[in-house]
Amino acid sequence: MRIHVRVVPRAKRGGVEPLPDGSLKVRVSAPAEDGRANAAVIEALAEYFDVPRRAVIIRQGVTGRSKLIEILQGT
């Protein structure tokens, strides 16, 4: 499954919020430095979809706030 994600780094509170267009807004407290926000996004989405972290892959947007995420099923 592939989903579009909009990331908000350095948020006061973290969480995953579905948006009307079918994408997700992911708020993380980690800063967008040295991949810390990406790691926090992977952690948040793994928890949200109840899958292991290794099942969450950033396909596009590693350096931006808009990302294309792939969730691998059956891992």
Residue spans for each PLM region:
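C-terminal structural segments of small proteins and small subunits
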Residues: D34, I42-T75
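Solvent-exposed beta-strand sheet faces enriched in polar/charged residues
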Residues: R6-V8, R27, R59, L72
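Compact, glycine-rich, soluble single-domain proteins
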Residues: R6, L19, K25-E43, E47-F49, ...
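A generic structural motif
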Residues: A11, D21-S23, G64-S66
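Short amphipathic
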Residues: M1-V5
